Amino acid sequence: MAFADRLLAAWYAGHPALALLRPLEALYRRVVTRKRARFLRGDSASYRAPVPVIVVGNITVGGTGKTPMILWLIEHCRRQGLKVGVVSRGYGAKPPQLPWRVQADQAADQAGDEPLLIVQRTGVPLMIDPDRSRAVQALLASELLDLILCDDGMQHYRLARDLELVLIDAARGLGNGRCLPAGPLREPADRLREADAVLFNGASEDRTDGFGFCLQPSALVNVRTGERRALDHFPAGQRLHAVAGIGNPQRFFNTLLGLNWQPVPHPFADHAQFSARSLAFSPPLPLVMTEKDAVKCRAFAADDWWYLAVEAQPTPAFSAWFDNQLQRLLRKP
């Protein structure tokens, strides 16, 4: 197990040795708290877009189902006739310039795996740039949009936001409740009180402290050809290699177990780069990966490589709440 994986496991298990990192945690908390306070006071400038900006992010390190939720938000807004754009940091991307407009036929190392997935699934206009405010301005210069979704960026206060949606893994929660590096929190837990909504991935019902949503498997898709198959393409008990280069690989492996398959788990670091050699496992079995990983593997995928398509399913209460927020944000003065 890599050091990063061991540290992540310790954060969520509450390992006592993490107490040694509390002096560094105190320094980190002071820095992030002061940074946010400067923007709240107006001492540091932020850019406010002429259209509503909705930030979808988290305060923890590790996967929370952010990309599937963004896909749901895009389609939900489109069904109401809204023109939606997306901005993202483009973690790991190496574009020729910044800001960079992501196109569906670009390579993942140029566009970033998550932005490329979003564009390939939805065709939405999407701009990447670590400076989210610059990305928003570039997007609005080329598109007439009704609103913008910011993929992550909770801590990017240079971009003013009209709505904050925070995602949390319902099973792991906030771990030991400590900030980096003694715990998984990017900001202190009381930051959640300032968010407009908290959504718990893996909660089939709403909670007193937020809404619930689940990731529902919908199909198997061939990585090389794009052919879609029903989930019963593999019979119960099917052994297969399972690849996950995401923030919480175990959640993916558990999903495969829940489909009555027998995965041989191969966890990789989040945003890992793959090659045919790195995925040449023994014994020869069908291989199933996440959709985020699949966008990086199409060029060298074998015939029996598949990705599991999943769809975010928030509760009806969240859908109703979100519709009310859209009406508020888009109400003409």
From Swiss-Prot:
The keyword Zinc-finger does not apply. It is an enzyme of class 2 (transferase). Transmembrane segments: none annotated. Its EC number is 2.7.1.130. GO terms for molecular function: ATP binding; tetraacyldisaccharide 4'-kinase activity. ATP binds at residues 60-67. Pathway: Glycolipid biosynthesis; lipid IV(A) biosynthesis; lipid IV(A) from (3R)-3-hydroxytetradecanoyl-[acyl-carrier-protein] and UDP-N-acetyl-alpha-D-glucosamine: step 6/6. Pfam families: LpxK. GO terms for biological process: lipid A biosynthetic process; lipopolysaccharide core region biosynthetic process. It catalyses: a lipid A disaccharide + ATP = a lipid IVA + ADP + H(+). One of its GO terms (cellular component) is plasma membrane. Keywords: ATP-binding, Kinase, Lipid A biosynthesis, Lipid biosynthesis, Lipid metabolism, Nucleotide-binding, Transferase. HAMAP family: LpxK. Belongs to the LpxK family. PANTHER family: TETRAACYLDISACCHARIDE 4'-KINASE, TETRAACYLDISACCHARIDE 4'-KINASE, MITOCHONDRIAL-RELATED. Transfers the gamma-phosphate of ATP to the 4'-position of a tetraacyldisaccharide 1-phosphate intermediate (termed DS-1-P) to form tetraacyldisaccharide 1,4'-bis-phosphate (lipid IVA). This is Tetraacyldisaccharide 4'-kinase. It comes from Pseudomonas putida (strain ATCC 47054 / DSM 6125 / CFBP 8728 / NCIMB 11950 / KT2440).
